């Protein structure tokens, strides 16, 4: 693995350990060069309660690797989480900087009704 990826995963591990200690439901984000994925994971980490990505049929047609797509994913994951009965989550940015697509997804999820 590259040094950049190793340091990102180390940051993610530290944050996830803290969330596991607090036993909170988390909104986990993964970003690749072409797509962005979001999952709402149960407090014990065993179940995915809601998920959305730019690979979903609703979002696949437009551009998938930009801020607009991340905003749509954020709104969709918030809608699905509310349907699953989740309103409070901890934001797991997976070691990515809170900037650009990750920030856009978080802001859209907040607007959709999720509380961080």
Swiss-Prot record:
Pfam families reported for this sequence: Ribosomal_L18p (PF00861)
GO molecular-function term, one example from the UniProt record: 5S rRNA binding
Gene Ontology biological-process annotations: translation
Matching Gene3D superfamilies: 3.30.420.100
CDD domains: Ribosomal_L18_L5e
Keyword Ribosomal protein: yes
Membership in a protein family: Belongs to the universal ribosomal protein uL18 family.
Function field: This is one of the proteins that bind and probably mediate the attachment of the 5S RNA into the large ribosomal subunit, where it forms part of the central protuberance.
Name assigned to this protein: Large ribosomal subunit protein uL18
